[in-house]
Amino acid sequence: MKSLEEIENILRKHKDELHKRFGVKKIAIFGSYVRGEADELSDVDILVELEGSIGWEIVDLKEYLEEILGIRVDLITKNAALSRKRLWEQIRRDIVYV
């Protein structure tokens, strides 16, 4: 199981590629990894803020993140999170921008 620090380092290393290929302006981790509750079965929850809109490319982005991290990823855009007030409140409590 990777640590939060390892995940942050991998995302930092790939930040330019994420921006170039997918228009990722900001990327953050939230959920069980940030709270220190992750185990071997946990996925990593990732929030992205994008330069523009994204369609089916979100699937490619998710697959790319899973490939570089070696962990199952739950991915949400900031706009999607903001449109669900209760979800956004949960995310805001433990979000860590990379």
PLM segments and residue spans:
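Conserved histidines in hydrophobic membrane contexts and catalytic metal-binding motifs
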Residues: 29
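Short beta-strand->loop micro-motif that forms the acidic, two-metal-ion catalytic signature
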Residues: 45-48
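Catalytic core of pol beta-like nucleotidyltransferases
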Residues: 1-26, 35-36, 40, 51-98
